[in-house]
Amino acid sequence: MKKTLVIHPTDPTTDFLKPIYEGRGFTEVTTDFQSDQLKERIQNHDRVIMLGHGYHHGLLHYIKPVIDESFVSLLKQKELVGIWCFAKSFFDAHGLTGFHTD
């Protein structure tokens, strides 16, 4: 079975996305986005689901970047789902594949 990591920064305005992953046995990261630890978690999973608010340059936790171009080399090796505003721009700019929103 593939190991799935969910990165969904805590934000009550995106709680409606929780049914996508809750109760499925996925590893969930909703707080504590230290870059080195997050990269290690990504490396140890086959699939990465990224949810929340974002912009052209990646996924945000309020105004702080959580996923940005420094993660691209790791993400290219994974099955990806990106659900945030402008996820398509981020995926396209970095040659990432997978399901993503516009």
Indicate where each model-derived feature is located.
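A domain-level signal for caspase-like cysteine endopeptidase catalytic cores
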Residues: 1-49, 81-82, 87
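Catalytic cores of nucleophile-dependent amide-cleaving enzymes
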Residues: 47-102
